[in-house]
Amino acid sequence: MIYIIFSSIFAGFILGFLVRVFLGRLSLLDLEKNLTKVRVESQLEIENERKQIIANAKSQMLKEKNQQDRDIRDRKNEIVNLEKRLLQREETLDKRISALDKQQSRVDFKIKEFEQKEKAIREKEADLVKRLENISGLTREDARKIVIEKVEHESRRDAQVIINKSEQEAQLLADKVAKDILVSTMQRIVTEVSSEFTVASVELPNDEMKGRIIGKEGRNIRALETLIGADIIIDDTPEAVVISCFDPIRKELAKRTLERLVTDGRIHPARIEEVVYNVTNEINSIIQEEGEKVVFDLNIHGLDKRLIRGLGRLYFRSSYGQNVLSHSKETAIIGEILAKEMKLDPIVVKRACLLHDIGKGMESISENSEGHAITGAELAQSCGESEIVVNAIAAHHNEVKPESLEAIVVQIADAISASRPGARRESLNNYINRLKRLEDIAYSFEGVQKCYAIQAGREVRIIVDNVLVNDEKSILLARDIAKKIEAEMRYPGKIKVTIIRETRVIEYAR
């Protein structure tokens, strides 16, 4: 029984295997049929595409051939037309050449006729000249010279008459225009008249204050005069102290310092130094403000800070009794008006006029007119001013040659401002120049820190560097300065030379 079961199972397996093999072969046959069908279809598609491509190519070639044939026909037609036009042009040119040849022949014939006529005229002219020479007794060249000389003489005479007349008219017109411009300019400005004095007075609450100003053994007044460089004159004038100083800045410094000390009531050397320091700062602020104010009033832009400060210092300066800053401002206004009348650049002229006396605002420059122009020009050049402005500053006293019309206008404006009645006083300026010269002589020696000409120029008080100048050198320095003053200056009486050498040692107890 088991054998039969196993035999049945085995037979089943074999039968299944055979069925599977048979089915597999059937599948392979179907697959081969499909592949054969696909191959045939692909070949048919490829053949169709090949035929289509060939047909398209033939069609495209046919189109291109037809297009080329049309282009060739068009080109041939163009060439034929061009040949026709060229033939027409050749025919036209031939006709023109023929016409020109005929015209040239006529011209040549006319030229020959003219040459024959000209020859005949020359022969007649030569015959006439010979007859005239025989009649007048002059050759042709002699007659030509006589005629030329006569015409030349008459031309020169007429030209000279015209030139003289033109010069006279131009001179009259120039004088009239110049007068009109100057009158118009001077009528359009309004100037302030100001005079500077070398003395100032400070009112005191009572005469006892004079003793406090002098101090014990005169230490307070010595400290004031040493720090400020001005004469403090205490005399019998009731309730007043007189300050004498040729330098307006130092005079103002002394006046304000004394007023503040009198108001405060504390007067001793330490307090004096403190007040002098504070007042110096105030005056420096005033200098800056005045410089900025005049620049703003004149609408001038781009000035260097050093130039603005120099203008501010001119507020305290005077020349021949005329305030230098007011003079510079007045000159700038006049120069601007003149520049507009003369069709020049008014901005450049106004700038140069304002800065023309800037050299007087430098501490190391003398107040005389010689030297400050060149020094001011050098300062303006170092501050970046233009060459026209620099030359106008340097040339306003003719120390150098003016190189532009603007420089001439600056000279004219300066002269107008300085020459108006009451503008200047010669005596005051000479006095200031003499005191300045005293200080300049002292500053020329090594070791001099500060120098003040006081007592109306009868004394020079000099503060020296205690490191560079010892006691022995102080004696020699005073003698050398006195000898140089004797050699270079003319003055009545005597001038006292005082050397001050001070050593300060400061230490703090903590």
Swiss-Prot record:
GO aspect biological process, one term: mRNA catabolic process
Molecular function GO labels: RNA binding; RNA endonuclease activity
Topology relative to the membrane: Single-pass membrane protein
Domain of life where this protein originates: Bacteria
Top-level EC class as recorded in UniProt: hydrolase
KH domain span: 198-258
GO CC annotation: plasma membrane
CDD domains recorded: HDc, KH-I_RNaseY
PROSITE patterns associated with the record: HD, KH_TYPE_1
Keyword annotations from UniProtKB, A to Z: Cell membrane, Endonuclease, Hydrolase, Membrane, Nuclease, RNA-binding, Transmembrane, Transmembrane helix
Pfam family, one: RNase_Y_N
Domain HD residues, every copy: 324-419
Main location: membrane
Location of the protein in the cell: Cell membrane
SMART domains per UniProt: HDc (SM00471), KH (SM00322)
Enzyme Commission number(s): 3.1.-.-
Chain ranges passing through the membrane: 2-22
Physiological role: Endoribonuclease that initiates mRNA decay.
HAMAP family reported in the protein's UniProt record: RNase_Y
Family stated for the protein in its record: Belongs to the RNase Y family.
UniProt-recorded name of the protein: Ribonuclease Y
Organism: Borrelia garinii subsp. bavariensis (strain ATCC BAA-2496 / DSM 23469 / PBi) (Borreliella bavariensis)
Gene: rny
